[in-house]
């Protein structure tokens, strides 16, 4: 039987780079909130132990796709611990709405949805903590999607504290470029010494993103998108880009601005939510 699973976007409401470790990874402080908008995964269990991705992604080999890697990882770990029913497999297809290299967490969200959905469908019985640990091996942003609650993140993004920021409306705009994360993090001018602050202090400050100055400098499309949005509302970059977003108190205000978006901007309106749509599905 075919099942349908949300794979929501996230926004980084703020993002501060606090240092760089010896292994090259950057330490940060960021605030994750989900959107009621994203991809949808369609999963049909198989009984022959096979994993098939029915909707290949351009320029990504199926076996390298995070969806397939997440499914195989869960299969391996559940099997090794005696929790995988014989013959467990799946046909997986994706309805893709989130851009690659957009800073909305699309790939990480897809991986998390696969872990949560297949753990449920295969009845493996892994805990959320176990799934989050698996997710971290796939990417630093995967655990927040697995846990499914808005969170303050520290370390390299893996130390999560659940929080409940206001659930605002957002106009999210993709300026038509893809920004690989390493392009931003390897830039010598990226701020890497923002002082660490407590979550209580940060929530009282004006939010910003340390990556924004680099993204605007290196990608004129991002600069143009932010310049346009800032005419209407407080706006900033999410993650390492390329998407930017503006914050509104009401849906109608956000939609009024959306109607005026220039043709070169691919934009949508969505609500910030502190409980992931994926986890709402499981309640």
From Swiss-Prot:
Molecular function, one GO term: 4-(cytidine 5'-diphospho)-2-C-methyl-D-erythritol kinase activity
SUPFAM superfamilies (UniProt xref): GHMP Kinase, C-terminal domain, Ribosomal protein S5 domain 2-like
Pathway recorded for this protein: Isoprenoid biosynthesis; isopentenyl diphosphate biosynthesis via DXP pathway; isopentenyl diphosphate from 1-deoxy-D-xylulose 5-phosphate: step 3/6
Keyword Manganese: no
InterPro entries: GHMP_kinase_C_dom, GHMP_kinase_C_sf, GHMP_kinase_N_dom, IspE, Ribosomal_Su5_D2-typ_SF, Ribsml_uS5_D2-typ_fold_subgr
Any one of the GO BP annotations: isopentenyl diphosphate biosynthetic process, methylerythritol 4-phosphate pathway
Catalytic-site annotation from UniProt: 10, 141
Annotated catalysed reactions: 4-CDP-2-C-methyl-D-erythritol + ATP = 4-CDP-2-C-methyl-D-erythritol 2-phosphate + ADP + H(+)
E.C. number: 2.7.1.148
UniProt keyword annotation of Magnesium present: no
Binding site for ATP: 99-109
Pfam families found in the cross-reference section: GHMP_kinases_C (PF08544), GHMP_kinases_N (PF00288)
Keywords annotated in UniProt: ATP-binding, Isoprene biosynthesis, Kinase, Nucleotide-binding, Transferase
The family this protein is said to belong to: Belongs to the GHMP kinase family. IspE subfamily.
PANTHER family the record matches: 4-DIPHOSPHOCYTIDYL-2-C-METHYL-D-ERYTHRITOL KINASE, CHLOROPLASTIC (PTHR43527:SF2)
Function: Catalyzes the phosphorylation of the position 2 hydroxy group of 4-diphosphocytidyl-2C-methyl-D-erythritol.
Self-association state and partner proteins as the record states: Homodimer.
Alphabetized HAMAP family for the sequence: IspE
Record's protein name: 4-diphosphocytidyl-2-C-methyl-D-erythritol kinase
